[in-house]
Amino acid sequence: MNFAKILSFVFALVLALSMTSAAPEPRWKIFKKIEKMGRNIRDGIVKAGPAIEVLGSAKAIGK
């Protein structure tokens, strides 16, 4: 009888620890979408930098 109580207590302890240690997956991914948009904008600005410099120098030569 005592062994059954100890076994059930250990089982309940393991069950409780396994439920609390698992990290839930975030349900709202809106911040990841905002971060991706910001990354795309930043990359677009970095890629457009040399083209803007060429246009500026061509405009200066044309004057």
Curated annotation (Swiss-Prot):
Q: Give a yes or no for keyword Secreted in this entry.
A: yes
For the modification Isoleucine amide, the affected residues are I61
Q: In which tissues is it expressed?
A: Highest expression in fat body and hemocytes. Is also expressed in Malpighian tubules and to a much lesser extent in midgut. Not present in silk gland.
- Tell me the first and last residues of the signal peptide: 1-22
Lineage top rank: taxon = Eukaryota
- GO BP, sorted A to Z: antibacterial humoral response; defense response to Gram-positive bacterium; innate immune response
Q: What is this protein called?
A: Cecropin-B
Physiological role: Cecropins have lytic and antibacterial activity against several Gram-positive and Gram-negative bacteria.
Cellular component annotations (GO), alphabetically ordered: extracellular region
Q: Which residues carry this modification: 5-hydroxylysine?
A: K47
Localization per Swiss-Prot or TrEMBL: Secreted
Keywords in UniProt for this one? Amidation, Antibiotic, Antimicrobial, Hydroxylation, Immunity, Innate immunity, Secreted, Signal
What's one Pfam family here?
A: Cecropin
This chain's source organism reads Bombyx mori (Silk moth)
Q: Does the keyword Hydrolase apply?
A: no
Propeptide ranges are: 23-26
- Protein family (similarity comment): Belongs to the cecropin family.
